[in-house]
């Protein structure tokens, strides 16, 4: 029997069929090799968009810098970065006029945050450029290294633990004539192995002191390391992203705090909220535009796309915005906030690893590091690379490139949103002073513009005016990639609006399935994804039930844990059958131990262990939830964990799931190969750091855990806490007298050791 596919949709409103257009089934593309070429592309493009600006030389670093601000206005539709200071300031003034007190209040909120933020705020985030080692590191390690170097150079304000005091050290460090740092290096020796009598290469890790003069230090402090953005779908070419170092991070954080506070108060801003809250906020703006348009008026919506948003933004413009926003505030506050844009105006982009060369016969390979690009003969490169290098040479200093104009990806998302909204704000009739008016939505570089006018000419005029107003502040709406529709149908930040936002369930498809963390987490994440999609994405009960069955099937194949009474033979089936036969209450076995699946769409919110606890044999309970089980490198788990799920589009999302610690919550061991490299010292530091933090959390369970303020160190805080807890436990009879005495003795020993040190 033939089925006509159109019949499937007879009862379905057209907008609900969006999930059937899903193109992203396979793995997303990842980048290999170096990002050097992509970074050079970014730098060259950025300079091209601002080429009519003024060239200057930075007196401290000697870097050549291009300043396009207040440059000539473009005469064509090509993207350009010539923002006009007075236009930006005026847009800010009108934004404030429409929202009385918005800047004032946001400044007060930010000042409060600045007073309270601790320096460990900077340990959040993934890879960070570590200027002491000149490469990327996890954020916590990079921060620890920076503080260690600061202290050994006599900068000690950071010891208070407040972020603002750490930033005082950063400012002071820039005035120092030299900074002494410790770097890791490795020595290789050929030695004979006693056992096998073969020659082996032995690596030893050394640390050596190195002095950086003021110029070298400034270059490192202003450096953004670059990498290639991975897993981007729908693009032919990869592109570069940047990670700033610890000197810049803190200042950026405070600027973004201020901008976030402003965005929260702007109804057109798609940041900082997300999910359903964002949809509600946006639906409001659309509703407002549709209800306010008189019956005779036309209303059109542009699904907007901006050309090279980051590369045409300018830190100098952000400085002007901050200067205006904070104009009646105390001097110290204005200074703290203006440092980030000033540093970005003088930023250097690190070119990454450099180029790899292979000989024709593929026998020889050699790496040309970025530092050599200034002097190497260009005959070895192909035409396009040669052009790139020629363009970039005047800007090169020690393997970094001077990049004054432009903002690298994702640095000032909130502040650039404020700029975008300020242009949307100018669409009110009292500002356009004519028959057309506009409003819209802005979220970083993505926008939707709603224009109302009595006739088509008016709509066209409104769009033109918006386009030209944007040009004045360095925003380039792409005429090729933006399209216009009757209001009621548009797309914004991958939300599709058609008389209300349409659930695009297919976006979530890549996050269904088995994550591959461990048996316990995978089960929990799998059912949570299904539950969340029933709540947020119109996943109906029948489809959810099907998704659940498919997930269980997938899970059993992944972990080879088919039911104990199945005929399927796998490596594990022998053991699982034995367990099945020994178990009295078979319903109590976890799926990963060959048990049956008890999940249905009504109980997805219950962790599997809790769901089956009452059904388990007693000895099975004892084995499963036993922290002393010697065969398991056991991981303690907070009651809620975070998993990273990948939707098809947009950034990886963090999703909470319930975690019950069982013997299935194992962690795979770290790959050995890292232990032989110069990373090893860093790894050990990191583990020590981790252990200290874990220990500390033991003493201060998160409910009662306030970071020790004042001078007491972590150790002192833990010792005093141990004494208090021990006394309470002793007096209430929870511990014996001998145990109490032993705890007190250990505490005294620790204090004694500290005094000796």
Curated annotation (Swiss-Prot):
A motif (Nuclear localization signal) lies at residues 187-195, 203-216. Phosphorylated by host PRKCA. It catalyses: RNA(n) + a ribonucleoside 5'-triphosphate = RNA(n+1) + diphosphate. Residues 286-483 form the RdRp catalytic domain. InterPro entries: RNA-dir_pol_NSvirus (IPR007099), RNA_pol_PB1_influenza (IPR001407). Residues 249-256 are annotated as: Promoter-binding site. Coiled coil: none annotated. One of its GO terms (cellular component) is host cell cytoplasm. HAMAP family: INFV_RDRP (MF_04065). Influenza RNA polymerase is composed of three subunits: PB1, PB2 and PA. Interacts (via N-terminus) with PA (via C-terminus). Interacts (via C-terminus) with PB2 (via N-terminus); this interaction is essential for transcription initiation. This is RNA-directed RNA polymerase catalytic subunit. The lineage of its organism: Viruses, Riboviria, Orthornavirae, Negarnaviricota, Polyploviricotina.
